[in-house]
């Protein structure tokens, strides 16, 4: 199973790093922004932002942000495990 330590971060702009990982139909994007020590993630389905229950903290609110900020590597690991389980057992 892919975990945070297996992500391949690429510098997409000065000091801006991004890694992508596919889980079935969903693509996870993990970003480290310049000057930050925590990560943010977003999920995509066919290049469109998606929100998933159990991953997005405010999923049931009328409006919640597609991007989940201020994540530690262990938080990203937990999200990756959930995505893997959704994909592997679908």
Tell me what each language-model feature is:
Residues 1-38, 62-66:
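Negatively charged, low-complexity tracts enriched in Asp/Glu with abundant Ser/Thr
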Residues 1-3, 10, 44-90:
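Mixed-charge, Lys/Arg-enriched low-complexity segments
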Residues 41:
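Conserved small-residue motifs centered on glycine
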